[in-house]
């Protein structure tokens, strides 16, 4: 049995957990406070979902003293019923099922709590500067640390860690799909350019600058998906592939999904703790994979970024952006599954020696038929610096 914790904020953590669960051979249980549709669970006889109580709201919601235990943890509000029940469910599940490894995606408190049961823990490391005391603690207790970005983005040793970081590539729910199956940008002669504006569920209000960009461009078909009060579709794959340009925030799952579609992208990073999305956007810009706009940029700069990206997309004669290859989406879920299996079997040192291709997971980059782009690795996405 392999245990997986998926954070409830946004949809990306659950999507990543489901993708990796599908790539594993063992029984898997995903523990989360998020709502997971029954039809989203791969192989329900092997993969199960356990609902965790929320640790926010209700009594002891953080208004009381010391919700961070003196800065040593991120969120442990005193006398909070939900937190107590949450950690009790986690400990009881571990005691009952004795998982061979537990993957935390991602919570310092869950990481430490699982490790305190004597269970080997693997944790996801997110981009940004993560050298505060809670991250130092969490990084140090893990048997392995994984990152959902490519090797070209860098693999620094996270602050507090005793083991190297393993970048597995962008884990996307769309990794098995072919973005070239339908008409690609530049192949639809006579049609108006198509711009897709994605607004996710991870937070952030409506940025009215994009309304002005839409009005300024005028000559394009502008489609908006997601966001508070917006139109949602369960599967945006066709829209991703039909768009000449996609405008998106810089969340890890968002970028992985865009990479799977080999989309031409304008990235507008949202403000997140530890500079997470800013770090990802900076790496995309450094690798020449996206136009990046800032939160304070005027409308004319946003218009210019979209127009430049449209020009590249429309002149590409149907070729993708190259994001899929460079972001190493193909086989990423299998590579992360390989890390979990290696730790479960006590082969942590093999993970360190062999890097992303390990544990019998030779499908992946090789099986996809794609060769990774060789670029110097720099610690730009960086875990903690």
What are these regions (language model features)?
Residues 7-8, 26-83:
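Conserved nucleotide-sugar phosphate-binding/catalytic loop shared by glycosyltransferases and other
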């Amino acid at each position: 049995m392999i245990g997986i914790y998926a954070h409830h904020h946004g949809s990306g953590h659950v999507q990543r957990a489901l993708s990796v669960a599908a790539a594993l051979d063992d029984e898997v249980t995903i523990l989360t406070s998020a709502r997971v549709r029954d039809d989203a669970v791969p192989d329900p006889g092997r993969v199960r979902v356990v609902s965790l109580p929320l640790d926010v709201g209700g009594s002891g919601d953080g208004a009381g003293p010391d919700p961070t235990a003196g800065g040593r943890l991120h969120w442990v509000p005193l006398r909070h019923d939900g937190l107590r029940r949450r950690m009790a469910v986690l400990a009881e599940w571990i005691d009952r099922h004795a998982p061979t490894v537990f993957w935390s995606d991602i919570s310092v408190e869950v990481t430490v709590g699982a490790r305190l049961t004597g269970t080997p823990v693997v944790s996801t490391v997110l981009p940004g500067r993560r050298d505060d005391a809670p991250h130092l603690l969490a990084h140090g207790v893990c048997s392995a640390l994984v990152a959902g970005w490519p090797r070209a983005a860098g693999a620094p040793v996270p602050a507090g860690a005793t083991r190297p970081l393993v970048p597995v590539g962008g884990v996307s729910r769309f990794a098995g799909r072919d973005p070239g199956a339908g008409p690609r940008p530049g192949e639809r002669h006579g049609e108006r350019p198509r711009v897709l504006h994605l607004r996710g569920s991870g937070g952030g209000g409506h940025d009215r600058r994009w309304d002005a960009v839409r009005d300024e461009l005028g000559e394009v078909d502008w489609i908006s998906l997601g966001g508070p009060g917006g139109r949602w579709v369960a599967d945006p794959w066709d829209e991703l592939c039909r768009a000449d340009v996609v405008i998106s925030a810089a969340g890890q799952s968002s970028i992985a999904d865009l990479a799977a579609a080999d989309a031409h992208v304008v990235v507008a990073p949202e403000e997140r703790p530890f500079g997470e999305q800013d770090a990802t956007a900076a790496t995309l810009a450094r690798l020449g994979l996206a136009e990046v706009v800032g939160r304070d940029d005027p409308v004319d700069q946003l218009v210019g970024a979209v127009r430049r990206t449209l020009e590249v997309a429309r002149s590409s004669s149907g070729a993708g952006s190259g994001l899929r290859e460079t972001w190493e989406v193909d086989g990423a879920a299998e590579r992360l599954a390989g890390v979990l299996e290696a730790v479960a079997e006590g082969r942590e040192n093999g993970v360190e020696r062999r890097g992303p291709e390990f544990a019998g997971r030779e499908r992946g980059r090789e099986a996809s038929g794609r060769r990774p782009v060789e670029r110097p690795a720099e610690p730009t996405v960086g875990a903690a610096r």
